[in-house]
């Protein structure tokens, strides 16, 4: 049986560039990840594909999934639900494949309470002025919504201490490389590999006894 995969939880304030950095991480074949597509009730943006960028669902559909316990985590953010389907994540980890979750901060904290051995990475902007410039440059939100997102970002940055790692997104390629190094290092943590060697030692002892 293969070792259980790593659950990588990647989050940060709205507009920090999570999606762009995640795409950069996945653009090179040096590590195999399975990207867990999040579910949301927010409107689909131009160029987004259902089942690729997000699973887009109505509020009623989402609330039914919550009621039946089919979400690993969920959060309501600026009037919309975001969450992670549970079954897909567990099935993939059990196959020994790493699962990469790009989710909101509220959701990440829920996951940490359920899966404490996950790898929690917080993506930060260089500063709040840069974050506001990025939100304005997206051209998808009103000034009122942008102001709400900045206030929410301050609250989320204060929760950074709940994460294992913080990565500054000052340049996309560099930020992606930092995240990949973190994941590579996590695979070598003693508590993640000791089980394999415990089994090896047990098998060796049993073989000597048999002789």
Swiss-Prot record:
CDD domains: GMPK. It is an enzyme of class 2 (transferase). SUPFAM superfamilies: P-loop containing nucleoside triphosphate hydrolases (SSF52540). Residues 5-184 form the Guanylate kinase-like domain. ATP binds at residues 12-19. Gene3D superfamilies: Guanylate Kinase phosphate binding domain (3.30.63.10), P-loop containing nucleotide triphosphate hydrolases (3.40.50.300). Essential for recycling GMP and indirectly, cGMP. This is Guanylate kinase. The gene is gmk.
């Amino acid at each position: 049986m293969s070792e259980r995969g790593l659950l990588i939880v990647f989050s940060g304030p709205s507009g920090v560039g999570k999606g762009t950095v995640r795409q950069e991480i996945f653009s090179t074949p040096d590590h195999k990840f399975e990207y867990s597509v999040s579910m949301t009730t927010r409107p689909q943006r131009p160029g987004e594909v259902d089942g690729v960028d997000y699973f887009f669902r109505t509020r009623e559909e989402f609330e039914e999934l919550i009621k039946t316990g089919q979400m690993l985590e969920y959060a309501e953010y600026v009037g919309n639900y975001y969450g992670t389907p549970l079954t897909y994540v567990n099935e993939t980890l059990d196959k020994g494949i790493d699962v990469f979750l790009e989710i909101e901060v509220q959701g990440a904290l829920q996951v940490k309470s359920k899966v404490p051995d996950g790898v929690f990475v917080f993506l930060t902007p260089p500063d709040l002025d840069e974050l506001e410039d990025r939100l304005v440059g997206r051209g998808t939100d009103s000034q009122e919504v942008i102001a709400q997102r900045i206030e929410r970002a301050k609250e989320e940055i204060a929760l950074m201490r709940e994460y294992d790692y913080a990565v500054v997104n000052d340049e996309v390629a560099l930020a992606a490389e930092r995240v990949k190094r973190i994941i590579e290092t996590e695979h070598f943590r003693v508590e993640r590999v000791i089980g394999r060697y415990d089994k090896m030692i047990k098998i060796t002892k049993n073989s000597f006894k048999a002789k």
